[in-house]
Amino acid sequence: MKDFRVNDKGELEVFASPSSSHTDFDFYIGKWNIRNRKLKERLNNCDEWVEFNSTDDTTHLLKGFANMNKFSATFDGEPFEGIAIRLFNPQTKLWSIYWADSNAVSFDPPMVGSFDGNIGKLYCKDTFKGQEIIVLFHWDKTDIDNPVWSQQIVILKN
């Protein structure tokens, strides 16, 4: 199944999986202790990973068609907080994730996508350091007690 494409106008189009459902993120409801890894620098040929712990508390909203989580961590000795609001559109069968954090204190462009079984893929077209990019959020809930989230960034060629 094709998840997304960039059309002739340069717009991102995302396609829902037939099995996409408002219950796709139910596995994430509750309190989590998370072990994270991130690259020290993005899009700079960096291969140095930084590891850190965080907590996450996720609750249902809007009769199960949305959820919200609060992410808390410490980076370089400073407290860091983030919130994600996830909304499911029953007409399009697409999820939209809106993220804000204590660094930017504003919402990022929404990630949009769906789950196909245990695998969720959500996409966003954005700009990073003046370069147009596509961001992929990849969720794997195959092991419901240890779900895995990862992020990939691809630079769009002009």
Task: List each language-model region with its residue ranges.
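Hydrophobic/aromatic beta-strand elements that line small-molecule binding cavities or substrate pockets
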Residues: 53-59, 73, 82-87, 109-113, ...
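Short beta-strand segments and strand-loop junctions that repeat across beta-rich extracellular domains
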Residues: 25-28, 34-44, 88-90, 146-158
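Residue-level recognition of beta-strand termini and adjacent short loop/turns
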Residues: 62-63, 143-145
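An exposed acidic His-Trp-rich patch
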Residues: 102-128
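N-terminal leader/targeting helix
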Residues: 45-79
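Amphipathic/hydrophobic helical signal segments and adjacent flexible N-terminal regions
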Residues: 1-49, 57
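Short beta-strand segments that buttress and anchor functional surface loops
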Residues: 69-74, 97-100, 122-127, 151-153
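Helix-adjacent hinge/juxtasegments
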Residues: 73-109
